[in-house]
């Protein structure tokens, strides 16, 4: 069953379909990882699409170097990062928000970008 009807209304400078029910209490979260060494110029399309689909009540977490979570030898850097993600989850569960500094820290590289690229390229 569709969540919205064919009817439209203008909200700000855009049009959106009228919902079949009141979904204003819902919150939306995107957690997106990638295999690149940083968040710049890698997540923008996914973030833009998510914001178009869910223009209000959204939280976005981006995690570069995410394949490292599958490498046991990277635990020295991935376990502390996973602890930050769990902390963010606790904040979100309690208040519906995540501290901006915490989001920034989660989105930062776990190791230097050049080192990550060298590992991926088989240079280490």
Tell me what each language-model feature is.
Residues 1-56:
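Helix-loop-strand module that forms the ligand-binding subsite of alpha/beta enzymes
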């Amino acid at each position: 069953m569709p969540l919205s009807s064919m009817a439209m209304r203008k909200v700000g400078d855009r049009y959106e379909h009228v919902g079949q029910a009141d979904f204003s209490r819902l919150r939306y979260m995107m957690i997106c990882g990638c295999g690149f060494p940083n968040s710049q110029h890698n997540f923008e399309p996914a973030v833009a699409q998510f914001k178009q689909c869910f223009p209000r009540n959204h939280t976005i977490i981006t995690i570069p170097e995410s394949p490292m979570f599958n490498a046991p030898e990277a635990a020295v850097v991935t376990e502390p990062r996973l602890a930050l993600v769990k902390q963010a989850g606790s904040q979100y569960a309690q208040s519906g928000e995540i501290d901006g500094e915490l989001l920034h820290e989660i989105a930062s590289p776990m190791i230097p970008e050049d080192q990550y690229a060298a590992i991926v390229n088989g240079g280490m």
